[in-house]
């Protein structure tokens, strides 16, 4: 009887626990219920990996390893069985007295550490844990980024490795300032060995866990290598003297701490018995070592990642970490999450087609229960301006159908590709946001105030002191600053300490008054920090230093940016207040400075703003949008020119394409251009091999109207490697493809799906090769008979029957695309006119300025305030008041 009750209860317990995670699919539940030992979760794009992480942590804390177990802490009674049956049937929680019977080896929330790559991901994880576990228990789980976790460890143990607990975190600009000082001391010519190159080499060494001493001991391959090692040692010495870490140091120094101090290592292994790491495919050598050192003897480590999305090799990430995980951690259980909840099946099939060409991968195939959706739209543009117009057309159509600007993202391989899109959107009045532009905290006035705050937090921070000692101007010149630095170095003290006794140094006699005034400012700020709230302290820094007065004076003189800079400082104070509200009693100056040091580009992305988003594919990792435009899909652009010479680099480019494709939820638009200007040079590139890897059944191809017109007139749109002409059609070749000189290749084929063979192609073009026809561009050499309906040279695609019109899309009124077919003449506005904008709504014209045959119109919109736009390009309609 007892045994049967035991079995019945355990079966009911499994059912009860499974119902708590009823929204998960089978593979997700497997991942959640695998609690002990090393676990590798290969999570495909859009497969719900964050959901799995949150639910796995919740299961560890609420039930432990109870699911699938036949163990109970005491003998089962009929009352236990009855109570559990009732809870299952009614969908209610089991009674509290039964809690102990539902758990086995349950984990305390403070014994779990979850590491992510982005602050945004860490924030989402914390929020979802709070919602699932309750505020207090959810907050006790340590969910953090790699760098934030390291800062937390170093704040407690930095003194063990010779640094103060109040250390400063240097950003790229600070590192460059330190390096300039090192170059000056070592008499190194920046033209021979650029500072940027030295910093990059140092970063690689730290990622590889190479110390300055090891770098000096290792024989250099050339003079620059020897210089880099000397610079590395001198740079680290300066950072140690300043009590500062750069961004790479946060992980590098934490690894050194854990490796060299067994007591510290054991403390964290005992504290965090369960370790979960997200985005494991993007970990570096140093991050792998950190994870290994934090993993305790029980090896309760769970890593989540997708080898097909490993795209950060240029930052030191190594895909081998995830590919070799099972070998490094014997006994690993591997679970694949292949069901996608994000995209349509056509988008996923396109992604699968591309990524299957990689060899360095674990292997998985995404699938979905979502609708088939529209085919992937592939557009061939005449040039980058045409590409931008096409994107505006599509967005305009979506807006007419009730869509939102924020539903759209334009993704590109490199930042340089954004300029034509941004320029066109600006002229067309399409609100947009570039992610990865200048960050708020990188603005000069903001960095200056943060530097003042930093020297109050860390008096040894000579780099930040140098930045602001004469900002605003105080008659403290570079010569005086150099003397202060020399005196500090001679005595082994900080520059601030020298300034505090400036009157004791004869060498500083000419600058006594300015230096003493600066010291008085510093003392006032110290007092403010001790006696006032953190946001009040920030306001004091802005005012006591004279910074606010300087900007107010600039504004009075008519300096255009002074008012904006003052607003930025007001926002800085708001940011400090928000930080205090979020952290409560734990708020501190050091904590605030940590937060701003660890902010990434993507953290500034505001999803609630109704704007089209422009960003690199690297920045888009982890995001999703209903409509995605993947531009510049051409050989030499994507994949990049350099990647062609390395199979590993080419596979990384293909993974990047896979990431770009899988950002799309509803519709994906891919474009390539016959000609493109990049870095001041016009390039004529073949369509990307990644396009050709997508099976024809998943794509729909369209072309620029200009290419269609040239096709109908008998002009080719291609070019050859040796014959100039290209877009104008004066080419000696009509296309490319295996055993064919045309795009179309075989009869009825699509040029995108020919196997690329550079040695066999006769030239680049876009010859039409419809059903029953051949591509007959200049010099094609095709002998197949041509059917009626295609007499043009080039500019075609291998479609059945006649070429398809370029677009069925309706552009929004007033957009440049809408006026492309026929000019309607210039628009003219006057002050006082009432206008209607497609996006901004109704407004009144405040000012009009002539500009290159157009007008710059300043309009006060009722909904969004004052905006400037170009009259001939903005979607504006003049309204007659009744």
Q: What residue spans do the PLM features occupy?
A:
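C-terminal accessory regions
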Residues: 633-865, 873-882
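ATP-hydrolysis module of ASCE/P-loop NTPase motor domains
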Residues: 35, 40, 117, 137-141, ...
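Conserved helicase C-terminal RecA-like lobe
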Residues: 217-221, 404, 418-430, 443, ...
């Amino acid at each position: 009887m007892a045994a049967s009750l035991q079995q019945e209860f355990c079966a009911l317990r499994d059912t009860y626990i499974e119902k708590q995670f009823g929204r998960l699919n089978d593979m997700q539940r497997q991942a959640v219920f695998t609690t002990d030992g090393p676990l590798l979760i290969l999570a495909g794009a859009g497969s719900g990996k964050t959901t799995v992480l949150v639910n796995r942590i919740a299961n560890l804390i609420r039930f432990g390893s109870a699911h699938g177990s036949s163990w109970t802490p005491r003998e089962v009674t009929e009352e236990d069985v009855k109570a559990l049956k009732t809870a299952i049937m009614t969908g209610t929680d089991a009674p509290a007295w039964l809690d102990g019977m539902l758990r086995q080896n349950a984990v305390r929330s403070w014994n779990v550490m979850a590491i992510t790559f982005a602050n945004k991901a860490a924030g989402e994880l914390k929020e979802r844990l709070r919602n699932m576990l309750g505020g207090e228990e959810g907050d006790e789980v340590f969910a953090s980024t790699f760098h934030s976790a390291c800062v937390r460890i170093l704040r407690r143990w930095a003194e063990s490795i010779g640094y103060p607990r109040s250390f400063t975190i240097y950003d790229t600009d600070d590192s460059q300032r330190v390096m300039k000082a090192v170059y000056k001391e070592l008499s190194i010519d920046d033209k021979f060995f650029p500072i940027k190159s030295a910093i990059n080499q140092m970063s690689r060494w730290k990622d590889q866990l190479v110390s300055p001493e090891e770098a000096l001991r290792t024989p250099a391959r050339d003079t620059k290598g020897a210089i880099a090692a000397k610079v590395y040692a001198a740079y680290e010495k300066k950072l140690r003297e300043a009590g500062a870490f750069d961004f790479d140091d946060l992980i590098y120094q934490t690894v050194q701490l854990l490796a060299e101090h067994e007591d510290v290592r054991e403390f964290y292994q005992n504290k965090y018995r369960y370790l979960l790491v997200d985005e494991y495919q993007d970990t570096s050598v140093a991050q792998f070592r950190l994870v290994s050192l934090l993993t305790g003897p029980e090896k309760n480590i769970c890593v989540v990642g997708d080898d097909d999305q490993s795209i950060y090799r240029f930052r030191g990430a190594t895909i081998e970490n995830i590919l070799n995980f099972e070998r490094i951690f014997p006994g690993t259980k591997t679970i694949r999450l292949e069901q996608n909840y994000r995209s349509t099946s056509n988008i996923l099939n396109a992604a699968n087609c591309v990524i299957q060409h990689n060899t360095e991968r674990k292997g998985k195939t995404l699938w979905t229960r979502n609708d088939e959706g529209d085919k992937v739209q592939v557009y061939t543009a005449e040039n980058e301006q045409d590409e931008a117009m096409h994107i505006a057309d599509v967005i305009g159509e979506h807006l007419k159908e009730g869509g939102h600007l924020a539903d759209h993202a334009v993704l590109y391989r490199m930042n340089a590709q954004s300029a034509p899109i941004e320029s066109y959107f600006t002229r067309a009045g399409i609100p947009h946001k570039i992610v990865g532009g200048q960050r708020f905290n990188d603005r000069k006035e903001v960095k200056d105030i943060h530097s003042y705050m930093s020297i109050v937090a860390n008096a040894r921070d000579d780099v930040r002191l140098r930045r602001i000692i004469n900002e605003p101007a105080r008659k403290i010149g570079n010569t005086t600053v150099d003397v202060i630095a020399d005196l500090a170095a001679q005595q082994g003290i900080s520059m601030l300490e020298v300034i505090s006794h400036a009157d004791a140094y004869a060498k500083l006699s000419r600058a006594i008054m300015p230096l003493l005034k600066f010291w008085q400012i510093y003392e006032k700020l110290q007092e403010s920090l001790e006696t006032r709230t953190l946001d009040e302290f920030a306001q004091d820094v802005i005012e006591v230093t004279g910074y606010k007065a300087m900007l107010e004076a600039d504004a009075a003189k008519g300096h255009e940016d002074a008012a904006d800079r003052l607003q930025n400082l007001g926002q800085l104070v708001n940011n400090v207040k928000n930080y205090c509200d979020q952290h409560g009693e734990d708020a501190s100056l050091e904590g605030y400075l940590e937060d701003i040091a660890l902010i990434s580009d993507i953290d500034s992305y505001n999803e609630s703003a109704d704007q089209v988003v422009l960003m690199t594919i690297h920045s888009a990792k982890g995001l999703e949008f209903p409509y995605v435009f993947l531009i510049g899909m051409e050989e030499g652009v994507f994949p990049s020119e350099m990647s062609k010479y390395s199979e590993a680099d080419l596979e990384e480019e293909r993974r990047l394409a896979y990431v770009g494709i899988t950002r799309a939820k509803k519709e994906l638009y891919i474009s390539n251009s016959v000609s493109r200007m990049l870095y001041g040079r016009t390039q004529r590139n073949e369509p990307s091999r990644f396009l050709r890897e997508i099976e024809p059944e998943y794509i729909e191809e369209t072309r620029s109207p200009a290419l269609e017109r040239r096709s109908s007139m008998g002009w080719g749109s291609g070019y050859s490697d040796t014959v100039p002409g290209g877009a104008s059609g004066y080419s000696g070749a009509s296309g490319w493809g295996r055993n064919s000189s045309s795009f179309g290749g075989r009869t009825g084929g699509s040029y995108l799906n020919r196997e690329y063979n550079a040695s066999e192609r006769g030239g680049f073009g876009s010859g039409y090769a419809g059903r029953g026809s051949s591509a007959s561009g200049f010099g094609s050499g095709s002998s197949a008979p041509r059917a009626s309906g295609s007499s043009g040279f080039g500019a075609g695609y291998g479609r059945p029957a006649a070429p398809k019109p370029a677009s069925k899309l309706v552009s929004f009124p007033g957009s440049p695309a809408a006026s492309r077919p026929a000019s309607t003449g210039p628009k003219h506005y006057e002050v006082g006119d009432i206008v209607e904008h497609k996006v901004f709504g109704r407004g009144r014209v405040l000012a009009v300025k002539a500009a290159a045959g157009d007008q710059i119109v300043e309009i006060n919109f009722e909904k969004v305030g004052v905006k400037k736009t170009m009259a001939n390009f903005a979607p504006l309609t003049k309204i007659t008041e009744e």
